[in-house]
Amino acid sequence: MEEFQRYIELDRSWQHNFVYPLIFQEYIYGFAYDHGLNKYILLENAGDKKYSLLIVKRLINRMYQQTHWILFANHSNQNDFFGHKHKKNLYYQIISEGFAVIVEIPFSPLLISSLEAKEKKIVKSHNLRSIHSIFPFFEDKFLHLNYVLEILIPYPIHLEILVQTLRYWVKDASSLHLLRFFLYEYRNWNSLITPQKSISIFSKRNQRLFLFLYNFHVCEYESIFVFLCNQSSHLRSTSFGALLERNYFYGKLEYLVKVFTFTKDFCVILWLLKDPFLHYVRYRGKSILASKGTPLLMHKWKYFLFNFWQCHFSLWSPPRRIYINRLSKHSLDFMGFFSSVRLNSSVVRSQMVENSFLIDNPIKKFDTIVRIIPLVGSLAKAKFCNVLGHPISKSVWTDLLDSDIMDRFGRICRNLSHYYSGSSRKKSLYRIKYILRLSCARTLARKHKSTVRAFLKRLGSEFLEEFFTEEEKVLSLILPRDSSISRGLYRGPFWYLDIICIHDLANDE
């Protein structure tokens, strides 16, 4: 970002949020490539020729000439002016990456200043950015709550909604018009945002730009909760949390009155939704709103969200996107876990003089279980097993060295163990480890044209050590396996505060 700052200071127009001139600067696209912001995207090409910065420079020059740009966008059946029809999508991707870099520039000073301010107040604030920090929050709060709203955030059916979100921050109309033109003329724009299981799925080739726009779309509606709940400490959104400061937001409060058609008194709206025990958590396209209140209050929140999305964002959301559930009777499907609050009975015997009686004390406990079926489906998609969970050999890795094969399988196994270490029941996790271990053994046996039994007999314990996590190795050296303390540590949940994101298992190669 320092290199961007040095070049941008040459042009004072950006200080007034005029980013339009930067679109025609070729060094922006060079940075997007050289700094590895999305190298896999820029190098992804169906043809034999690799990425060419010269072709991008020619494309930028053509953008000055509107007639040539329109011809290039509209005449998809003819040869483009590069003479490489099959590479058109590649250079649309490059322009998309350049746009992503440019639209992020006006927000970088705000983001940096906000993070610097937070570091002065909160020590080790990086732990709060871990997605695993959500589950200790659940353990601490959910035991005292009653109801939960499971919300699937509606995706924008029109890209214009995403562009309009930027207009409050970027005052340069020219850059927004060009961004809008680029989105509309993109040949495969219908595949950029696809409804799939009621969540926004972004194309991998254009993930940076459209994920940026979508996060702003979500962040804008989340800022309403900051005002309504008046408890910003409970709002632990893991994405763009530093951008929740909205100077322009208070000028739009009058629009909230229109959300509720049955009243014109804004104070009445706040009173209807006031809840001192309201907690909100979001990860990607799913959010959870938990409360200690009554079912009537949860229905009010549900009604508010439906009307707010429709009136303020022009988004229609079907009723099935929000579910009201009781925590004591329902499990939350969130971030790969089934989370629930269950009651454990603790029986205490009490004796008074000659009479004795038993006291049954119910104790609430937060329970997390691994969703084994989707996880096995991911392993099957990555060709580690079949759809029934039977391990198979990874044939595409048979050309690698034995050490590389074992390292890849071991890394995937350790990463899964690392992420799902917070599970209350380890049986499902042991099954996943078994699938990966046997798949690795079959891959090595296939490479050496041997049997799995003979291969395991030759390697012995050295093969199994590749699949141990660092924590398991340390515990095995300190404590014996048959001790009660060791068994408690192995079975107990662990939550790690260094997990920032989740990668696709099929692409972990």
Swiss-Prot record:
One of its GO terms (molecular function) is RNA binding. Its main location: plastid. It is found in: Plastid, Chloroplast. One of its GO terms (biological process) is mRNA processing. Keywords: Chloroplast, mRNA processing, Plastid, RNA-binding, tRNA processing. InterPro entries: Domain_X, Maturase_MatK, Maturase_MatK_N. One of its GO terms (cellular component) is chloroplast. It comes from the Eukaryota. Belongs to the intron maturase 2 family. MatK subfamily. Usually encoded in the trnK tRNA gene intron. Probably assists in splicing its own and other chloroplast group II introns. This is Maturase K. It comes from Schlumbergera truncata.
